[in-house]
Amino acid sequence: MMKTLSSLLLLFSVSLQAAPIERVISLAPHATEIAYAAGLGDKLIAVSEMSDYPEAAKKLEKVSNYKGINLEKIITLKPDLIIAWPAGNPAKELEKLEQFGFKIYYSQTKSLKDIGDNIEQLSQYSDDPQIGLNNARDYRTHLEALRAKYQNLPKTRYFYQLSDTPIITVAGQNWPTEVFRFCGGENVFDGASAPYPQVSIEQVILKRPQAMFVSPHAIQNNGMWSPWVEEIPALKNAHFWQLDADWLNRPTPRTLLAIEQVCEHFASIEQKR
């Protein structure tokens, strides 16, 4: 494979940095959504395997998935810009793309603010930058409206389950923790050393969360918590909800929908107090 890559590199050794941005590749679902929001939809030529929004993204060639990046295909497609996800794309493969001279925009999202910033920064590569600037402005305006609406929600201790075999959750500052925090959520596993720790049912029972959230596609055993209704306040009080995984787990303008969904659930708890 490396011999083939080297041959391709020699063929395309001209500098890509100085070329106008006409051909764009996205390596993550959220990056694809951000690209469309930034006005780059007409320039996208390939995306990641799970890029399914907006609808037009489904028709594009696929060059990456959870296993890695198809370097040979990307080199053949000769993109002017690659939108990468440093938290999800293999670092060594991104380094190789850099060595080949490709221009890479790293879509880092550690805060809700970063979503608007990513849209705005990528808009410079659009033929009509105003599209991205308008979408970034609309996102920020809507975010502040939600902040004003839900700023007085009380603190609620929650548990967010990403999968059931094993049970995986989120810790620390890792996405989508900020969505829950925006709504007054306090992660019961916030202090875990791993970013996405594996936990046990016993640990969840001991943490006594007031609310529990799951993603429908990640939960295969719908009855796994049934025996523990009396031990976990969230279950005893029927504060157990499914969330739209795409809204929540992808840092895009649709995160606003996730915020409203989570905040409304926390608000319903407050109404019962």
From Swiss-Prot:
Residues 1-18 form the signal peptide. It holds the Pfam family Peripla_BP_2. Gene3D superfamilies: Nitrogenase molybdenum iron protein domain. GO terms for molecular function: cobalamin binding. GO terms for cellular component: periplasmic space. The record marks E72, E202 as: Important for BtuC binding. InterPro entries: ABC_Transporter_SBP, ABC_transptr_periplasmic_BD, ABC_transptr_vit_B12-bd, Vit_B12_bind_prot. Belongs to the BtuF family. Part of the ABC transporter complex BtuCDF involved in vitamin B12 import. Binds vitamin B12 and delivers it to the periplasmic surface of BtuC. NCBIfam families: PRK03379.1, TroA_like. This is Vitamin B12-binding protein. It comes from Vibrio vulnificus (strain CMCP6). The lineage of its organism: Bacteria, Pseudomonadati, Pseudomonadota, Gammaproteobacteria, Vibrionales. The gene is btuF.
